[in-house]
């Protein structure tokens, strides 16, 4: 059995996972009755809501219904935990009104302090307190004291750092290392500026990715499928054949920006034989997806058509109408069948579309609604594509992208593959399979989609993460998040504008409460166990669980919302458990964006391990390993899949901030020594993930990057 480098002890029956619970920890402290495993309240490390609330059914828990009594662990390791799980359970809810910013209930209490329609609460409930009290006596992990030595990091130049890596490779991939939205654009821009980097390509996924770029004049462009290098003269940008594209949306939302700005893209942008996202794919997404589970860009349905070989590609639009018509008729059967099964009329679909757009954010475009209204839908699509694509003089040039990229590398040029989404959002990662996108957005997926010869051409991956405020948008498990992933959407909070502006608006006070009260023993190494207490934050609008307060305050203060959907992202701690797997699979290089945010924090938290805990004592079998209460999952251990991760809670190492020595580009002198807090944070991340940190972001501008000497 291999030994981990920091000497973790193992459960004899399950290599790599130790157990932190002993019978004495829960003896005499019975947990209160609970709903079916998986229900969760809206708070940091989210215990199921109290009995008087109601619960939302979730299919994930059906896979592990066997009740398991608490058993004495074979190995005891010292740590503390509280429960963290998304809304699961089998109980159906009573009728409880959803949260409304300025409403009061019959008792006069603000509904922000009531149990919401999802079963979530804004305050800390009694069950949370009970569970925390039952577990608080567990002792700290020794790893909380690592690393023993803090490295000193010296700044170096772009040419002596990133450019040396570029020059040693043929294919450079910039890939997200968490759940998307990591700030990859800045690294993409830095690579694209290298003189030998002539080709920038998007090779898979679709318009569900989004990024904001600026040209030299400071003009803002929001691209979804278009590569970021479009604004750089002399660069060729490609959209490869494994991408999926709604060509109407692409013209109306992306190409129009170039036209309006007077940018000639004729020799800069080339499109391969992409799979086409049709209006019915987007409607299938709307009709078949749970709230907050999709960008409504038709990704899962179009990838289904692609795999079934039923859809259309771009070449079909540019050839005879009869073939196009036949393929559309066949592929549309899925949409028409769903309407029949759900007993929906065209008018019902139109109504749902308009409801989705009712807050002013256009999630369902007009032409998609027009398709839903059309009597002869196939003819509507044939005419739509004929007018908006085939006969559109502004539609970009088409080419064999695979051939062009291959030829460029043979000429000695460098190819940049711009990764959409991220490693953990890849459909090829089984750990989060149910809540991922539909393409393989790992670095391996990028290289495969590019069809570049991986034995002939040297490739390298630049992984990108973000801290503080690592974030995820959409549903799914994320143990290091401040609240459940569906916390906002469950209360019909679709955009940042839907958050009451006065709620948890004082970020300074919220983060101070988190680190002072949420980790009451943070300055006592013998007692700090890395588990966040379910304390409350109060302002003039009410009381909030500290996780809720941090989630709201972080989203507002950092402007954390999806570039495509505008959904508030759920922030949390930098997660070394997940990051370790990313670097072990995709290579050691890591760049951390937005680190200047740390200038405003008293402390910065880093998740170094998880602890599995389910209040009902239920166990989860993942890949033949049975996770039970008290099991510790360290960085470097196998990462379990979501049924277990829903019950995993972060063990957080705290690092002192650097308020007195800010690193923001506007405040820092170039080549000034980095503050000790920054060095300790970077040392901690490198220690637990085996990564090599190439650079850190310290401002909003493209060149606000501090490159680190290796």
Swiss-Prot record:
Biased composition (Polar residues): 10-27, 101-110
Gene Ontology CC entries for this record: cytoplasm
A Gene Ontology molecular function term of the record: magnesium ion binding
UniProt signal peptide: none
Primary enzyme class: ligase
Compartment(s) of residence: Cytoplasm
Misc remark: Parasitic protozoa lack the de novo purine biosynthesis pathway and rely exclusively on the salvage pathway for their purine nucleotide requirements.
Name under which the protein is recorded: Adenylosuccinate synthetase
Organism the protein comes from: Leishmania donovani
